[in-house]
Amino acid sequence: MRLSARLPGVQKRIVAESDDVIDLSTLHRITLPSGVTRVKRIEYLADVRNKALDPMTSGEVTEKYERVLFLNDVIFDVEGAMRLLWGTNVNEEGKAEYKAVCGADFITSWKYYDTYATRDTEGYSIGVPIFPWFGGRGDSTSRKDVLAGKDAVRVKSCWGGIVAFDGRFFQKEIAKSTTSSSKEREAQNSDHVYERSSSLAELPLKFRSEPESFWDSSECCLIHADILATPDFSDYTTNTNEAWGEGIFMNPFVRVTYDAKSFHYIKYAKRFERLFTPWQAIINHFAHLPRYNDRRMENEGDIVEDRLWIPNSFTPEQEQAMIDLQKNFGGKYGNASDSMEKKKHGKRDQNQKVTGRERVVTWIMRE
C-alpha cells in the first residue's frame, strides 16, 4: 500500500518466488567427488533474474520499455538512480546512450566491492579495491577514465549493485526493427584486444551460467558478453566515438553500499580518495594485481588445454564423478566431443597424478 501511494499512476508488477516457485529440478546439477549432486549457485541466481524479467522476455507485457534497472540489496538514493538511467554518456541531443551502465558498490565507505563481475576494457579484473580501483595493465583505459573524472568509464563488464540496461535487449520483438549490422573493430596497437564473437546472441537476452563443474563465471558478467555479441542498435549516435568503447560503462558518481553507515560516510571518503592513487599503484605492482587469468584472451571456438588433478585411486563415487565430468565437458552451449576425437590428449592413467583435457571455448555462445 505504501508503494502504491508513493507511485500514483505508475504501472507496477511484483514477481515473487512465493507466488511462482523456481523448480530446482530444471536447473543444471554438478556431481561432487563424493557423488553428491548440487545446484550451482550462479545458475540459480541466473534463473532468479530471468524469472523477474519473464513478463518482458516472454512478450506478456506489450509496452516497450526504454531502460531496465537492476538493484541488489543495497542502500541507494533516487538521485543516483536517475543519474545512472538518464545522465550517463549523454549525447548532443541530451539523451543518455549506453548498452549497459553500472554504479559502484562499496563494502565500506572507501573499499570497492564488486570484484567478481567487474572487468576493464581489456578484460582484466580490478586491482586493489581502493580508488581508482582498476589496475595498470595493458592500455589502462578504465583506470585513466576514472582518473579523468568521467561519468562514463569504459569497461568490459560490471554490476556494482545497481545497473541499467538498454531495455531493448530484454524485449521480444525489438530486434526485427532496430538492429543493424555490427561494426567491425580492428585491434590496433594492442596485444590485449578481444575479438567480437562471430555468433550473434538472439534477443531477448537471458541471464545464464557457466556450465563447467568447477569453474564459475558470474551471470552478471556473462550478460555483458552476450550484449557484446549482439549488433548495435541503429539509433545509437555516439558509437562511432572512441569514448564509446563497447558501449558498457561504469558511472563512479553513482555509489551504493550494503549498510546505512557506509552510505553515510561515502561523501566524506570521496573528498580524499584521490590520495589513494599512488599507493594503489604501488600495492598493485608488488601484489601482482590484476591477477593473471589464462582465459582472458580466449575466443569462441578456441581449443585450449586444462590441467586436472587426478588422485592415484578412486572410490566408485569418485570414478563416476570423473566420468560425468568428462561426459558433460564442453558445456551447456557447445560440445567438445568433435575436438576430443581429433586430438586425443590427456588420456587418464591411474598412475598419473596430473593430466590434461581439451575443451572448446563456448563462453559467449548461446543455444
Residue positions per predicted region:
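Active-site-proximal specificity loops/subdomain of glycosyltransferases
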Residues: 2-66, 71
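Alpha-helix termini
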Residues: 7, 55-64, 87-96, 229-243
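A short acidic, often aromatic-flanked loop/helix-cap motif at beta-alpha or helix-coil junctions
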Residues: 19-27, 108-111, 256-258
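Intrinsic disorder
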Residues: 35-47, 149-152, 156-159, 211-218, ...
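Conserved catalytic core of nucleotide-sugar-dependent glycosyltransferases
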Residues: 40, 73-204, 273-321, 325, ...
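Generic preference for well-ordered alpha-helical elements
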Residues: 42-49, 65, 78-81, 167, ...
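Terminal low-complexity segments of carbohydrate-biosynthetic enzymes
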Residues: 192-194, 199, 205-221, 225-367
